[in-house]
Amino acid sequence: MKRVVVGCCGFPVARGKYYSLFKVVELQNTFYELPSIEWAEGVRREAPGDFEFTVKAWQVITHPHTSPTWKKMKRKPSGSPENYGYLKPSKENISAFEKTLTVSRALGARIVILQTPSSMPDNEETIKNVDSFFENAKSLVKNEVIGWEIRGPLLSRGELYRVLEKHNVVQVVDLFRARNPFKGSMKLLYTRLHGIGPGEVNYSYNYTDEDLEKLYNMLVEEDYVEAYVMFNNVRMLNNALRFREIVVEKGGLEIV
């Protein structure tokens, strides 16, 4: 039976309450400001032993220094700002990725998510850079699953999918916007749900039962061993809880 793990991107309620409701969370603070090892170890200790953290990678790896979210960082990374972001194969990016992995390991996290912005250049240089980034980062990865959520025009480039396959990087998608993503040799499906609408995100959207039943059907149809269904909208708490209820009612999937 296919296994489905349901959770939220970030904590919509106090951590202690969240631990009693779900078995997984995708940490968001790791994206905005990479936390200390001490913080990560403390959060790991406070969580139940069977609780899982997934980590959204530090923004400096994926977003250029001109990104608005950079301005909110209290501690800017060392080195040349121009060498950060867009998965460039620079020593700065590789170092930031290594630091992200160190934090993720302190959390006991198995999955690390890279999310690049829609402004990422849609050209051959980007493809070469990404290929080199994953090649250079390969030696740093131990047992982690690396996922990449690609946004913008770059999604249409066929060469990109060869890079994913070459480096066994899972393609992270919103299933309401893209189907049959590359799931890696581990056949892992990771979907981040940003709300339904004409754009790439609609965080204010409230998923209806009809939407959630459609999501259930998509999960029945998709080929995978394990799926992570991570809600990333304003009403993610209620939507995630309701989706889990629907899966239990319909059966056919192992729900966590």
Language model segments and positions:
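Residues lining hydrophobic/aromatic ligand-binding pockets adjacent to catalytic sites
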Residues: 1-256
